[in-house]
Amino acid sequence: MELIQDTSRPPAKYVKGIPLIKYFAEALGPLESFEAWPDDLLISTYPKSGTTWVSEILDLIYQEGDLEKCQRAPVFLRVPFLEFSAPGVPTGVELLKDTPAPRLLKTHLPLALLPKTLLDQKVKVIYIARNAKDVAVSYYHFYRMAKVHPDPGTWDSFLEKFMAGEVCYGSWYQHVQEWWELSHTHPVLYLFYEDIKEDPKREIQKILEFIGRSLPEETVDHIVQRTSFKEMKKNPMTNYSTIPTAVMDHSISAFMRKGITGDWKSTFTVAQNELFEAHYAKKMAGCKLRFRWEL
């Protein structure tokens, strides 16, 4: 994987008013010709909400718990990232061309930028939502280590941008709410990161039911064990350690950092939390979604 040297810290590029990583914004043109297949399964999240975790769970389900098969390639190749693009690397769409059915694919795109083919084909979607405070903290550390993002600045200024929807992929509030609304008219299984942390087996059973598959209980237990944070953090096929340091610098922050609920409490000041709570109440007024800040 050779990357040319201009990957570092490009400013965000706005598409339909939504800020995106520059290279991903440039991939949206070619993405218009992407054709979804009815048996595709889309994993959708706002960044830092459990995408890699659920990708690995689903690949293990598709491989019927066969760990060897899930070691065939890094998770970002096994579950192509729809809008991914970076200099010198195959795009997500290029990877999908070589992926046999039934395909797993992932996206962070808000609905305004999602290829229409996915909705036209009634592709099943598994959406994972995570509480906004933990997302903000995790996203800040991800910005720091993944150099395709703009410079994150200080935590204080990053939090302000996050609240204003001025980070890559835009507003968390809009993202979680619009995909929730879609779940009323489209085949979307809407899951919560906190629920998977609390009882992964229960949530995996929901996934199996949604995709119309069944596995022996011992296989499900095996999947739970293999997709624990501890296991995935040390697995080179899931921890992104195969990505060049020029793109992701794990010495700044690990891709798989803590994987817990409530980490925001170690980062938010009292004043930041009060400001965030007031802003959150306004942005989520009238929304039926309820998030847990700790377990």
UniProtKB/Swiss-Prot annotation:
Any one GO molecular-function label of the UniProt entry: aryl sulfotransferase activity
InterPro entries: P-loop_NTPase, Sulfotransferase_dom
Tissue spec: Distal lung parenchyma.
Catalysed reactions listed for this entry: a phenol + 3'-phosphoadenylyl sulfate = an aryl sulfate + adenosine 3',5'-bisphosphate + H(+); 17beta-estradiol + 3'-phosphoadenylyl sulfate = 17beta-estradiol 3-sulfate + adenosine 3',5'-bisphosphate + H(+); 4-ethylphenol + 3'-phosphoadenylyl sulfate = 4-ethylphenyl sulfate + adenosine 3',5'-bisphosphate + H(+); 4-nitrophenol + 3'-phosphoadenylyl sulfate = 4-nitrophenyl sulfate + adenosine 3',5'-bisphosphate
SUPFAM superfamilies recorded: P-loop containing nucleoside triphosphate hydrolases
Cellular-component GO terms for this entry: cytoplasm; cytosol
Source organism superkingdom: Eukaryota
Annotated function: Sulfotransferase that utilizes 3'-phospho-5'-adenylyl sulfate (PAPS) as sulfonate donor to catalyze the sulfate conjugation of a wide variety of acceptor molecules bearing a hydroxyl or an amine group. Sulfonation increases the water solubility of most compounds, and therefore their renal excretion, but it can also result in bioactivation to form active metabolites. Displays broad substrate specificity for small phenolic compounds. Plays an important role in the sulfonation of endogenous molecules such as steroid hormones.
Protein name: Sulfotransferase 1A1
Annotated source species: Bos taurus (Bovine)
Gene that this polypeptide is encoded by: SULT1A1
